[in-house]
Amino acid sequence: MPKRKDIQKIMVIGSGPIIIGQAAEFDYAGTQACLALKEEGYKVILVNSNPATIMTDKEIADKVYIEPLTLEFVNRIIRKERPDAILPTLGGQTGLNMAMALSKAGILDDLEIELLGTKLSAIDQAEDRDLFKQLMQELDQPIPESTIVKTVDEAVTFARDIGYPVIVRPAFTLGGTGGGICSSEEELCEITENGLKLSPVTQCLIERSIAGFKEIEYEVMRDSADNALVVCNMENFDPVGIHTGDSIVFAPTQTLSDIENQMLRDASLKIIRALKIEGGCNVQLALDPYSFKYYVIEVNPRVSRSSALASKATGYPIAKLAAKIAVGLTLDEMINPITGTTYAMFEPTLDYVVAKIPRFPFDKFEHGERQLGTQMKATGEVMAIGRNLEESLLKACRSLEIGVCHNEMTSLSNISDEELVTKVIKAQDDRLFYLSEAIRRGYSIEELESLTKIDLFFLDKLLHIVEIEQDLQMHVEHLESLKKAKRYGFSDQKIAEIWQKDESDIRAMRHSHSLYPVYKMVDTCAAEFDAKTPYFYSTYELENESVQSNKESILVLGSGPIRIGQGVEFDYATVHSVKAIQKAGYEAIIMNSNPETVSTDFSVSDKLYFEPLTFEDVMNVIDLEQPKGVIVQFGGQTAINLAQALSEAGVTILGTQVEDLDRAEDRDLFEKALKELGIPQPQGQTATNEEEALEAAKKIGFPVLVRPSYVLGGRAMEIVENKEDLREYIRTAVKASPEHPILVDSYIFGKECEVDAISDGKSVLIPGIMEHIERAGVHSGDSMAVYPPQQLSKQIQETIAEYTKRLAIGLNCIGMMNVQFVIKNDQVYVIEVNPRASRTVPFLSKVPGIPMAQIATKLILGQPLKDLGYEDGLYPQSQLVHIKAPVFSFTKLAQVDSLLGPEMKSTGEVMGSDTSLEKALYKAFEANNSHLSEFGQIVFTIADDSKAEALSLARRFKAIGYQIMATQGTAAYFAEQGLSACLVGKIGDAANDIPTLVRHGHVQAIVNTVGIKRTADKDGQMIRSSAIEQGVPLFTALDTAKAMLTVLESRCFNIEAI
């Protein structure tokens, strides 16, 4: 069927900020979709609130709106642009929910706008738990016994009838938000109450638990002519009961018989046809391990996290083809871009094994609830490809960047058998490592299977890895043992550990016996047809399919899995760097391990190596490709941490040199450089042990800011105000980076701002200064940033620009650099310098319109700044005001304290832009879902050192119609100053303590601060948790509350009696 000619203009709805459950996979899908629609000649209008994405670049769509994804703003854009159709299925749950909201508000009917791809009725049938149940019954597809409830009492009655455990699944939520497995009535009441609040339609499905069944996924596609195919089938290592986003997943399925595969395949195709889905769809099924009995768990009628994984696992571009199907093209008339000869109707075949392992944030949130269930907790994921399961699993383990190079954590060797068995049964994020430890201790795989319900096939593979370890122990420096270990994915580092050698010895031994990896192509057809893709993975076999070209090449290292502190912003910079390399006439090679991102789309670079970002794996690619050099600036700390070892191995690092990277990271060298350049910094010292740290703090004076060097995202950073706290910090946190000393700095409570700069070593371009709304003490990634600065004098801005230029030239910076400043009493101090791309690059690239990563890459490749048409110094400021606001995922992370501090906690960001600060702030708050009513009750519970400042805020809140409530100490202080506040009860005083008031909807906002001593009491954490659980706006920094107040005041009319 030819593409539709009756529509010209299509709006694509993006997925908004990155949160747990909805990450970079939608940037990848949205980018593909917009480009595919443009390729077909349609005019594309994109709306998304996330500036950190490739998708929101001007060239991706004809018009790009970075605006809040709320009905208010999307409606305005629709009325302005008048699109003929909207494509909502590539914007995750956000896109689908927006489509439903537009329909319910009558906007689509009113403006005669069509929804493309999946119809509203299909979205409703798949997402509405009741309609889905009816459809499955009509299709004769088995689903677990279940009921739809709108109250807690209904849930309790049903559970009493069918027995526990039961699963709660709220309707229209993402990543299992609000759901869970309940083993008792108490758990059921708690989870259902929360689930009903989080469901936009106040509806939960309560179903019989089928935990322990195998969890299987089918990624399917269908077009308007009813052609349908399975792109990829996947099997979860973990049985049903753990969210698929938190499970280790293998593709293709590993343990199914042909009969089982055909049965589930037929069911998936039957469902997509019945729903009349046009595009991509994900079907999740549960299979009884002991019979042919199965259940349909759920259907996602859209492109999803699994679609991104399936696309990267097979090379089949699901989102691109889904967009083309949405405008009428059919699978049998579209060419598969991988082979260039077969049609998209041809089902991919894999002759390799793909492993996906989730990346969790518990290295940052040590007190978070780590037990896994039906609510997703991972922030990102890694993928690895191998010729056998062991190889792909071990490559994925070392891609995680959690300090392991194997499926082994050495710290587990000290735990008791009792603790080991508990951790094996109660699945946490690190269960794989406990299982492997149990096998090393001699537990049988049959015992482990009965404890975990993980299939014996997978446990046998873990046993095989342990057997290879034992073989290596018995045959030190034995060539055949080395070959076998390499064939099954062992790293040089692990083999060196077992043989008690250096990693370099293993590398030398391999090379002396010509034992090199070969690179195989991902071609969708198991080599049945010639493929055109430059998409490769390594393995230890004979035939190498990756041929070095005659063109000079540059290798760009990606940033690995998305985690807190290192998000999609770095992928953005990587993709732009590749574009500049190609424009400069070089072959651009990317190496990365993240299946969610645009950088791992094979069409972005000239060659893509889907490999772990370790010294060994990077060197193997360098040995084959012999690039002119390697760029490490755009891959975050992941790539920077490899620079030293690569340089020592004789690799050319392009851009800022390793010794200069060291001068920025090494405290003593940095201090020396600042003195030479005449730039002030907070007084500070380095310390390598407890005595030195205490001595430094005594000399500097408390409070001090302590942190390890060479970390990203404020990892293990803390403000301490006495010796006891400092001793506690040294004992617990120095582990964060044991081979490097810790930094002890004077803590200056002033205004923070940051700058990104681009330098060729002689000239320095500063795209802009970003002023932080929150004062020092809140991590820059968690602060709201304003561009251009609103409260910095011209003189201070000139000083910042001057210091930045001095630093860039003094540190021989070639490419990018990020500098953070604190200002107190008109004195500008440098806090830190990062000689690489930072997380603000996408925001600052979009706002003044400077393609920062591309310019930086051109300078790295040797072009002078002046030849690119840019002047030295600060770039002219934008006429609009732009706000970058953080987005948090606390609702998914039980027991993680939402108190903001020097360690980063946000998972994503949004942007608000307008003609005034107040309007831009309003948009930013709307975009990050901090919607505050115009009046109501606000609770203040304030630390002594900020009560005076909080008083003036409380007075302003009262003036616009808010009723002030406060805890005992705060209320007493307010009363002394002439402001009466309603007293709230102590925690535990059930009638009117804050959690109770919050639960009953009597509180519209909470302002809660703690003193500089950040070990906040339990009561404070309970207050903050109750606000997060009930979705009540919570401010733990007075500056953020002040910003919100500014917005509310600007929207208030003055009402006075005459």
UniProtKB/Swiss-Prot annotation:
It catalyses: hydrogencarbonate + L-glutamine + 2 ATP + H2O = carbamoyl phosphate + L-glutamate + 2 ADP + phosphate + 2 H(+). Residues 133-327, 671-861 form the ATP-grasp domain. Pathway: Amino-acid biosynthesis; L-arginine biosynthesis; carbamoyl phosphate from bicarbonate: step 1/1; Pyrimidine metabolism; UMP biosynthesis via de novo pathway; (S)-dihydroorotate from bicarbonate: step 1/3. It comes from the Bacteria. Keywords: Amino-acid biosynthesis, Arginine biosynthesis, ATP-binding, Ligase, Magnesium, Manganese, Metal-binding, Nucleotide-binding, Pyrimidine biosynthesis, Repeat. Its cofactor is Mg(2+); Mn(2+). Mn(2+) 4 binds at residues 832, 834. ATP 1 binds at residues 129, 169, 175-176, 208, 210, 215, 241-243, 284, 298. One of its GO terms (cellular component) is cytoplasm. Its EC number is 6.3.4.16, 6.3.5.5. Mg(2+) 3 binds at residues 820, 832. NCBIfam families: CPSaseII_lrg, PRK05294.1, PRK12815.1. Belongs to the CarB family. This is Carbamoyl phosphate synthase large chain. It comes from Streptococcus pyogenes serotype M49 (strain NZ131). The gene is carB.
